[in-house]
Amino acid sequence: VKTLKFNGTIIPDALGPVYDFIKRSNVTPKTMTDFLENAKGEDVLLSMSSGGGEITAASDMYTALKKYPGKVNVEITGNSASAATIVMLGADHVAISPVHQ
């Protein structure tokens, strides 16, 4: 199983370099599509902790997950709020502790 640490703010691809420069955790649609392309249809796990972010970027990630041929699992390791819930809903299976948000 390939794993992506999905931590930080969901942002458009164009803002990725800015967030990287100021050392802010982020995930972009390109992060997701590159990860899925490298997984080559294997089952994947998104280890997620995100307070959300930009809805269009989250929608692009949701679409990429729904099109992915392998099984997509999400494990909420911190929180999943706002736009992050859109991404989470693209998974085949979501695991979340009752004490997580």
Q: Predicted segments — roles?
A:
Residues 1-101:
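Terminal-region recognition feature
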